[in-house]
């Protein structure tokens, strides 16, 4: 444990930030998994709906720096390609 006041404050702030980041990440994951599940089921309409729900959330998290912008683009591109294969 830190002895210096600023180090104690920093530890508290880091823990608070860690909880917020974990919460946002866990909020994002089900939207991605919902699209994958719809593709495995072969339901194009449900997959498209899941993609439309997932896209703004992934973009928002990338804009806030939670995930890298290339990772967001990769999620969207992979899901779009899989949806197009279902046609």
Swiss-Prot record:
<keyword id="KW-0689">Ribosomal protein</keyword>
<dbReference type="GO" id="GO:0015935">
    <property type="term" value="C:small ribosomal subunit"/>
</dbReference>
<keyword id="KW-0694">RNA-binding</keyword>
<protein>
    <recommendedName>
        <fullName>Small ribosomal subunit protein bS20</fullName>
    </recommendedName>
</protein>
<dbReference type="GO" id="GO:0070181">
    <property type="term" value="F:small ribosomal subunit rRNA binding"/>
</dbReference>
<keyword id="KW-0687">Ribonucleoprotein</keyword>
<comment type="function">
    <text>Binds directly to 16S ribosomal RNA.</text>
</comment>
<dbReference type="InterPro" id="IPR002583">
    <property type="entry name" value="Ribosomal_bS20"/>
</dbReference>
<keyword id="KW-0699">rRNA-binding</keyword>
<dbReference type="InterPro" id="IPR036510">
    <property type="entry name" value="Ribosomal_bS20_sf"/>
</dbReference>
<dbReference type="GO" id="GO:0006412">
    <property type="term" value="P:translation"/>
</dbReference>
<comment type="similarity">
    <text>Belongs to the bacterial ribosomal protein bS20 family.</text>
</comment>
<dbReference type="GO" id="GO:0003735">
    <property type="term" value="F:structural constituent of ribosome"/>
</dbReference>
<dbReference type="Pfam" id="PF01649">
    <property type="entry name" value="Ribosomal_S20p"/>
</dbReference>
<dbReference type="GO" id="GO:0005829">
    <property type="term" value="C:cytosol"/>
</dbReference>
């Amino acid at each position: 444990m830190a002895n210096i006041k600023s180090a104690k404050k920093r530890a508290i702030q880091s823990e608070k930030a860690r909880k917020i980041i974990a919460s946002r990440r866990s909020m994002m994951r089900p939207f991605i998994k919902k699209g994958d599940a719809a593709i495995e089921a072969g339901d194009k309409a449900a997959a498209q709906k899941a993609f439309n729900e997932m896209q703004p959330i992934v973009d928002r998290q990338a804009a806030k720096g939670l995930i890298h912008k290339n990772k967001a683009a990769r999620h969207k591109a992979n899901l779009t390609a899989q949806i197009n294969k279902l046609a």
